[in-house]
A protein has these predicted regions:
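Loop-rich non-cytosolic ectodomains and luminal regions
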Residues: 1-225, 229, 234, 243-254
């Protein structure tokens, strides 16, 4: 694939993922091979709602999409509708009601706790921004998504970073041990590869290069998303550093 198209895949696919923590870019080996057949005018992506359960589960709402080049470096990003996890992420901005929401979520999880193999997409907001090391002390469960900013203006979701399934799916060596075990380090690596020529493409995904660089420099987590058994809600809610917790979606899974 031409180097220019590689660059666009690096910027576009990650920008879509970073701007929409309610969805997951499906990083699969066959998709990487498919990318090599693309022209520099568009990049194919497979996107699915951030559904709870194992990676082998068939997810309702999975879509084959493409990101197209426009003039002046802008791109046409795919439309992704809001759904329950989107609403949970938006609720992070409702700080006056955090305690009430947390209590309601804890009560709901207690009722659902008796259902065997019930998994949930759990959205957490922290009372104050935390380092990744502090987040790891809250639970032994590793978060699936780091929320590296608060919810942004104009209903934009938090800046985020998640794990990819394959080493080169993001356009750089995501299996490098220096970054593989740290979502913060992975995000910082991506931001370090961006330059001013990417500004218009990033704007197409409601992202700002200065904003991304600031988040990378600070390296602080404002929240996290977990794909876990419903019982994790009680553990997370018990920590005073967690100001709000929501269950975005539940499903039976492994």
């Amino acid at each position: 694939m031409p180097e220019e198209a590689d660059r666009r895949a690096l910027v576009w696919m990650n920008a879509l993922s970073v701007s929409r923590p309610d969805y997951r870019i499906v990083h699969e080996e066959q998709l990487l091979a498919k990318r090599h057949a693309e022209t520099s005018d568009f990049v194919s992506v497979v996107v699915e709602p951030r559904w709870p359960g194992g990676s082998s589960m068939e997810v309702y709402g999975r879509q084959d999409l493409s990101i197209h080049s426009l003039s002046d470096g802008f791109v046409e990003s795919p439309y992704l509708r809001s759904w329950r996890v989107t609403d949970a992420l938006q609720a992070l901005r409702d700080k006056p009601n955090h305690a009430k929401i947390k209590a309601q979520t804890t009560a709901l999880a207690k009722k659902l706790g008796g259902i065997e193999e019930l998994r949930a997409t759990i959205v957490v907001g922290f009372a104050n921004p935390l380092t990744e090391e502090d987040v790891e002390r809250i639970s032994s469960r590793v978060p699936d998504v780091a929320l590296l900013s608060p919810p942004r203006s104009d209903s934009r979701l938090p800046i985020s970073w998640d794990y990819s399934g394959y080493c080169n799916a993001r356009g750089f060596d995501d299996c490098n041990p220096d970054i593989r075990t740290s979502l913060t380090s992975g995000f910082r690596k991506w931001v370090s590869l961006l330059d001013s020529d990417d500004a218009n493409a990033l704007q197409s995904f409601d992202l700002n290069l200065s904003e991304l660089r600031n988040s990378a420099r600070q390296g602080l987590w404002y929240g996290a998303v977990y794909n876990a058994h419903i019982e994790l809600v009680a553990e997370l809610a018990a920590d005073p550093r967690v100001s709000v917790i929501l269950v975005g979606q539940v499903a039976l899974g492994q």
